[in-house]
């Protein structure tokens, strides 16, 4: 049954990822805002959810964490987009993207952790 839950939540996460990409994607843009957006949102939600999750069953935590949020965020796309920016000699955008992804992700994770912690009290 666990695989079924992960598959269902994975479908939802992948669909949300696609919809977010459609919402934020601009073909003329040099900077990949859609990937940055989903990764920052996903990082925040995973941290918040992980800390708040004890009220849910182990199966639900795994299904939502692995299925929904795992399929919503994407590290491989970060790598491809960064290499693409470097190959087209958009070095500043590549550096900004990696920096925002790392530091923005850490900030979103910390914020999610703190808000999740506050909600448990």
State where each predicted segment sits.
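Membrane-interface helix-loop junctions in multi-pass transporters/channels
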Residues: 1-121
């Amino acid at each position: 049954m666990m695989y079924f839950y992960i598959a269902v939540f994975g479908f939802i996460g992948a669909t949300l990822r696609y919809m977010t990409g459609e919402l934020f994607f601009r073909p003329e843009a040099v900077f990949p805002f859609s990937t940055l957006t989903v990764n920052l949102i996903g990082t925040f939600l995973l941290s918040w959810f992980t800390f708040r999750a004890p009220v849910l069953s182990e199966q639900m935590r795994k299904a939502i964490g692995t299925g929904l949020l795992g399929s919503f965020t994407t590290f491989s796309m970060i790598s491809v987009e960064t290499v693409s920016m470097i190959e087209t000699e958009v070095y500043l955008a590549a550096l900004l993207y990696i920096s925002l992804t790392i530091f923005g992700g850490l900030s979103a994770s910390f914020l999610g952790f703190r808000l999740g912690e506050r909600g448990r009290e």
